[in-house]
């Protein structure tokens, strides 16, 4: 099976994104436009191509992609124009389907797959999924094992079913299940419990040396924070000339370099103890992932 994400924002027809999304929810479908003039509904690919291939000079690549790759039981993330997230379980693969309502309202959604769709609270959406919505491409795979297993677990949880078998064995360690942003958030929360207040404006993508800066309300000291995951190394020597002390966290202890003068390593066991003591109030996505690996 595969995990995908799709933007519902048709450019043709009425090009009303809100109306198109509401239509998809009501009909239990997700998809794209590339409509034919005859609007002949069909599940036979060759019939669709015979007409659409002429209209669009063969440039129907996204429809071909959906036809080839989307199958029953795949999972698809989507997002409405107001920023709400949804997770969909595919019921059946590609078909050309334009309802009477779509024709009357000129809703440019016709190359579709039927699915069951559940709204997901933003607190339950993994950072990897959110990041995948930044590119403008309409439809793409989310090729991430953690996101796949979490999405299966989340579907089972929200639908109150056991539809998917979740591979817990590959993620027995919570830090293998958390993505980069979730691990940063965890350290963010830990430091605040230790009396360090994070400076929100310092949390920028172009801050190369630090993930964010923190300040002590009692002493006024400012410190940097760096977090890496997986097999990515943290080089302590990069901070030898830093004007700040720097907190470092790498859950797999991938530290290199000899500088110890102004770096403070947050030990893995310290973070595990923090998780255990704080799991009742940690972000729900982290709570879900703790349940997933239990």
Predicted features, each with a name:
Residues 1-72, 77-294:
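Mixed-charge (Asp/Glu-Lys/Arg
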């Amino acid at each position: 099976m595969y995990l995908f994400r799709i933007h519902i924002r048709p450019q043709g027809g009425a090009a009303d994104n809100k109306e198109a999304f509401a239509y998809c929810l009501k009909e239990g479908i997700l998809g794209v436009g590339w409509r034919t003039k005859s609007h002949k509904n069909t599940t036979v690919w060759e019939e669709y191509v015979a007409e659409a291939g002429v209209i669009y000079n063969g440039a129907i690549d996204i429809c071909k992609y959906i036809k080839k790759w989307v199958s029953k039981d795949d999972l698809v993330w989507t997002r409405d124009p107001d920023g709400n997230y949804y997770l969909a379980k595919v019921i059946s693969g590609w078909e050309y389907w334009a309802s009477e309502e779509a024709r009357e309202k000129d809703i440019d959604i016709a190359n579709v797959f039927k699915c069951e769709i559940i709204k997901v609270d933003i607190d339950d959406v993994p950072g990897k999924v959110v990041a995948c919505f930044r590119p403008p491409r309409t439809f793409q795979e989310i090729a991430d094992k953690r996101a796949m297993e979490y999405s299966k677990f989340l579907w089972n949880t929200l639908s109150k079913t056991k539809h998917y078998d979740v591979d817990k064995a590959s993620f027995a360690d919570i830090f293998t299940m958390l993505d980069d942003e979730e691990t940063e958030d965890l350290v963010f929360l830990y430091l605040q419990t230790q009396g360090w207040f994070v400076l929100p404006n310092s949390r920028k993508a172009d801050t190369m040396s630090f993930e964010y800066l923190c300040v002590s309300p009692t002493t006024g000291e400012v410190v940097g924070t760096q977090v890496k995951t997986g097999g990515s190394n943290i080089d302590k020597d990069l901070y030898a000339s830093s004007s700040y002390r720097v907190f470092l966290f790498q859950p797999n202890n991938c530290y290199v370099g000899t500088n110890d003068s102004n770096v403070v390593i947050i030990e893995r066991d310290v973070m595990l103890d923090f998780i255990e003591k704080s799991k009742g109030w940690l972000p729900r996505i982290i709570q879900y992932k703790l349940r997933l690996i239990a």
